[in-house]
């Protein structure tokens, strides 16, 4: 009886239990204030205010560029194209660090999944950085995020630089994208996928138990991290800043290799299939969706998406046509800029753009082509007569 009473009292008092998911919202708010400069609240006592102020002044200039050259024109562009009644679930393969673009492309989204080789990262370090460490970490972060906020995609090199240290790349980039679009964090949790694709959120005791198991690179030609494998995958819940009644948006970043050997039949594939019909996007994806070794993620998209925005690294034209999709092109595409891209699909893409009227594209969306032209395509079901 006494144990039952104690349990009820503990529940009523809001005391966290050992098996409850650990919420790192306090750490997320530190990132929101110190790294992405989402508000002007005092910084944590251990951090140098002047260093943060200087960083935030530089960030504001990057945000101004982001909105002027990308968020504003792209938002208007997509608003005129998106059909009514699209799913509010977004899947963004090869979407490392690019939550901001997902919100630009799909502003009505409520569930967003980005997938890349990079791990989410440890959220607990930044609040304890010494002045010199903080200055260096913020400088490295700005150097990396600058490409995203000025060129609107994240390079592999920039992602790799932040796979270790006090300000991990995926966590910081996604919170920055959220901040750039006017949102604030509500919850931050970490998880793994069970064999059936369901989500298992880590409790504090599980995170403690994994503290000495360092996350390893997912692909051989990548880099190892210096943080626990508990921080591989993140779930960031957020809403419009200053509006407690605004709808919640859930973003999950999952560290996974999308090559067939790792994806087909995997917990990730099952997790994605459980979502039902989705909208999709990809850009700056190294032309991997063209590749025979990525047939699983390509087929998943063809079977489950109802609308997709991409640069030319999206679905190959012949595969799209066979699955009943029509592709509408914008800008100019004269060929992939990476020599290792599939040449047959590259030629098909050139033919696709050449076969359609030239439609203006007022912003960069992913890679430029081999001649530095911006381009974009929409893959959508063919209209039924």
Ranges and model annotations:
Residues 1-3, 166-184:
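Short, solvent-exposed linear motifs at loop/edge-of-secondary-structure regions
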Residues 2-12:
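Bacterial N-terminal signal peptides
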Residues 14-18:
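Sec/Tat signal peptide C-region and signal peptidase I cleavage site
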Residues 19-147, 224, 228-230, 235-385:
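Non-globular targeting/processing and membrane-anchoring segments
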Residues 96-107, 148-175:
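Short, thiol/selenol-centered motifs that function as redox-active sites or metal-ligating centers
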Residues 112-161, 186-212:
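Thiol-based oxidoreductase modules, predominantly thioredoxin-like and allied folds used
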Residues 176-263:
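Active-site/pore-lining binding-face segments in mid-to-C-terminal subdomains
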